[in-house]
Amino acid sequence: MANRFLRPNLIHRFSTVSPVGPPTTIIPEILSFDQPKPEVDLDLSDQARLFASVPISTLLRSTAILHATSIGPMVDLGSWLMSSKLMDTTVTRDLVLRIVKGTFYDHFCAGEDAAAAARRVSSVYESTGLKGMLVYGVEHAEDGGACDENIQKFIETVEAAKTLPSSHLSSVVVKITAICPMNVLKRVSDLLRWQYKNPNFKLPWKLNSFPVFSGLSPLYHTTSEPEPLTVEEERELEKAHERLKSVCLRCQESNVPLLIDAEDTILQPAIDYMAYWSAIMFNSDKDRPIVYNTIQAYLKDAGERLHLALRESEKMNVPIGFKLVRGAYMSSEAKLADSLGYKSPVHDTIQNTHDCYNDCMSFLMEKASNGSGIAVILATHNTDSGKLGARKASELGINKENGKIEFAQLYGMSDALSFGLKRAGFNVSKYMPYGPVDTAIPYLIRRAYENRGMMSTGALDRQLMRKELKRRVMAW
């Protein structure tokens, strides 16, 4: 049986989708490729070519910082210190933040305000040809007052983006958790899950959106029927929609794409719901969607949800953008599921995650290449996925310059992959968070843990940077 939403040059096995209520599994199983992949210029071994544009001072700092974050005990000590009560002491806090700012913060973040971040975007593009994704680095808001403050920062981000040439900037990023109170997002997610279990359950506040669940979606967070939203909760949700609408309008007027970041599964249904609502509202240009949602491929239901959302967008003739990532909340997902007596919603093995990412990537690239209103940002630090994506683009004859396909990595990480993809002719961006140093601490701790160990994401960069430094020293 064939599925028109899966890429045609693969063979898949899956079951059907029920038109009412929770669908059954449609996750594809890749059996074989029927076409050889053409060679593509994505050589990540020649450090002299990859890092030719990087000043020696930057190479020295980057090598030192990535080496420091590869030392497990150092990462553990630094994480403990930045999360400890010692940070409540003014002298200690000021000292730690000064050290962090001159090292890890400057390596992984773009600046303390929107103007500084825009300048960093320009300098990165002018020296390397890599674009920037601007994001205000606040993550969670507990009340409406904090949300009102945060939306002003996101609007400032759009205003800063408008000062940059379009060639320098890929997009701006918004976090729904920063513009809608966390308790409201959790309540909305609970109610959406309960409606998925019981389709006759009414949600009078619900607006038009795409599907946010599939047959594999984790529903264990909501074990009993939730109470309806209170009047105050409905008011807060309406305000959140207005905040999101305000930033979407500015992005639409400026023709600046807006990426909506993902969170963990306890909140993600509400985020997907709001993301798809805004896509329906603001994605009117078939060639350049404004709103992008994020799909986390480490979730077992990622493939199903992607196909269902795209199916509905095609029915409604609404273009859509997706940012595809692997995911960043593995530990918290596993702990929460275990505490409730359920299996983790994350794939059981890293290979399953790789397979899911690569399958979703290939499917999205095919959709984007056939003239449909799809745009894709392939966010990955995995070199195998980068090489596969480059080969797939060559196989499909994708126009690398039209913006329908783009690669991305975090600022300060996977530079070898970024430079290699850029040399191969692709649009490549760096995710560049900004904000006060103290607000960036949770983000920096996550980056440190990603880079720890000899087999970490930063291992290839460290190896190639050291070789390039040695080459330059020997050439003197």
Curated annotation (Swiss-Prot):
Q: Null mutant: what phenotype? A: No visible phenotype when grown under normal conditions. No proline hypersensitivity.
Cofactor(s) recorded for this entry are:
FAD
Write the Enzyme Commission number(s) for this entry.
1.5.5.2
Provide the top EC class. oxidoreductase
Q: Which Pfam families has this protein been placed in?
A: Pro_dh
Please cite one Gene Ontology biological process associated with this protein. Answer: response to osmotic stress
What pathway does the UniProt record associate with this protein? Amino-acid degradation; L-proline degradation into L-glutamate; L-glutamate from L-proline: step 1/2
- GO cellular component entries: mitochondrion
Which key words tag this protein in UniProt?
FAD, Flavoprotein, Mitochondrion, Oxidoreductase, Proline metabolism, Stress response, Transit peptide
| Molecular-function GO term, any one | proline dehydrogenase activity
What compartments host this protein?
Answer: Mitochondrion
Role of this protein: Converts proline to delta-1-pyrroline-5-carboxylate.
Family note: Belongs to the proline oxidase family.
* Name by which UniProt lists this protein: Proline dehydrogenase 2, mitochondrial
**Species this protein is from:** Arabidopsis thaliana
User: What gene does this protein come from?
Assistant: POX2
